[in-house]
Amino acid sequence: MKSVGINGYGTIGKRVADAVSAQDDMKIVGVTKRSPDFEARMAVEKGYDLYISAPERENSFEEAGIKVTGTAEELFEKLDIVVDCTPEGIGAKNKEGTYEKMGLKATFQGGEKHDQIGLSFNSFSNYKDVIGKDYARVVSCNTTGLCRTLNPINDLCGIKKVRAVMVRRGADPSQVKKGPINAIVPNPPTVPSHHGPDVQTVMYDLNITTMALLVPTTLMHQHNLMVELESSVSIDDIKDKLNETPRVLLLKAKEGLGSTAEFMEYAKELGRSRNDLFEIGVWEESLNIVDGELYYMQAIHQESDVVPENVDAIRAMLEMEDNPSKSIEKTNKAMGIL
């Protein structure tokens, strides 16, 4: 049973904590928070030992009546690996300032720069390259979504080139200080966007160009993909391949699943905690091949799709499982992923 800690119990951190707790080969030793907010209180209520990453704020936790077990550094000393879920840019500083000095393995989130961490990870793309490594960055929610569907297509028939238009949510549901509220924003206004190069950190030889925009919604990201195929296949071949791929769902608009809002309603009907949809939802009706080019649309629940990949990264880095398919299957079974 490997000992895991979560540095940053927020949107991703709290989900990874629950995912790790569901496994039978790893456990959560503790989680960290900087502020005595409702998430800190609920972490303690759920039974997680809470450590503070800002020791000077200990009094504020005491005043709020939130039990603190110790400091983040004290937590790190007890761990085999830490999952860093701190805000963008903080993880790289933690790597250099704390983890390397302590000799502590760490996974990071997609907000960190690949070059600063040195290695990126996706369960389906480069699991074996991360086995035994000290530091790895789980690629972003958008990149994870692209890899989930492009990998099986590449395995089936090969890919010449990918072009993708990313329609990104403006903010997470709880983020009241972000937007846009009444605009469509090219983000970035330059082409290509960073998503293509991010995919190439795990699918090394893929020819991919992306562009992205922000829209006033909070529920999910949406992708529109155009994929030039190397060999001839039918739509049924593509459907069969995606249907057999873990963490991918073919969903039908004609069954009332024609929007991201309805995808989220589907997650509720699955009985998921926090309404999470770990799987990438592909609109089955969007699949089409024209002159050797595959077209399809998919949606990504940005708060949760990277969570199972964090669990797989732990197994790879701690050399708990060298077969990616076995780790994926084990993670999925424990988390109830389809």
Curated annotation (Swiss-Prot):
GO biological process, one term: glycolytic process
Disulfide bond sites: none
Catalytic machinery residues: C141 (nucleophile)
Key word Cytoplasm present: yes
Binding locations of D-glyceraldehyde 3-phosphate: S140, C141, N142, H195, G196
EC number: 1.2.1.59
One Pfam family named in its UniProt record: Gp_dh_C
Alphabetized UniProt keyword annotations: Cytoplasm, Glycolysis, NAD, NADP, Oxidoreductase
GO molecular function, one term: glyceraldehyde-3-phosphate dehydrogenase (NADP+) (phosphorylating) activity
Protein localization: Cytoplasm
Catalyses which reaction(s): D-glyceraldehyde 3-phosphate + phosphate + NADP(+) = (2R)-3-phospho-glyceroyl phosphate + NADPH + H(+); D-glyceraldehyde 3-phosphate + phosphate + NAD(+) = (2R)-3-phospho-glyceroyl phosphate + NADH + H(+)
Binding site for NAD(+): T11, I12, G111, R169, Q302
Pathway connected to this protein: Carbohydrate degradation; glycolysis; pyruvate from D-glyceraldehyde 3-phosphate: step 1/5
Subunit note: Homotetramer.
Recorded family membership: Belongs to the glyceraldehyde-3-phosphate dehydrogenase family.
Protein name: Glyceraldehyde-3-phosphate dehydrogenase
Organism: Methanobacterium formicicum
